[in-house]
């Protein structure tokens, strides 16, 4: 089962400490469950986890992160993630892994770099999960990876990919040595949820000249949220 992808059943429980009549009236004071569903689906597809245990830990860490500035919401006080693998034992039994994590117990790393900074959400033997912050007017310059697999989920509208607008909720699962560049022409920080396999290695972030013609990213594109959601402009 570590070689062939199998269907999973995921159950999420989000916990909030709230007083009566104090639940918020806008999405910035609540949580958009379309975003939650999209983030989780992206992680499970992009990270190619070999163990249910690492999958649930990565999901917990991502759902409990400080909300991105370009996708404001409240932060859950705790999350419980259960993942079932119905086909793992040929129907004799259904393996289930459940983890409960509280926001107050989470510890996240941060890395400052040339384009902005990165929140290190989770790292394990399979992969790393990161939130890339591109400041207003900033850029992730043209680069490739020769070793790391990489997938990136754009969290809001406003970024340019290869000089063209890319919508929030759109992910790209990049082939090795595929040149890509992001620009942020907006007046606010924009973020990208990034998965590297294995975890990020700065030696494999290889800067390259801007090509005369950008390679087309569309064959590597998939939407995870956005069509049913009011994205922040």
Feature annotation, model-predicted:
Residues 96, 129-133, 151, 171-173:
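Conserved hydrophobic/aromatic beta-strand scaffold that supports enzyme active sites
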Residues 151, 187-208:
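A short hydrophobic beta-strand segment most commonly corresponding to one strand
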Residues 160-180:
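Short acidic-glycine-tyrosine-enriched beta hairpin
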Residues 180-187:
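Asparagine-centered strand-capping/turn motif at beta-strand->loop junctions
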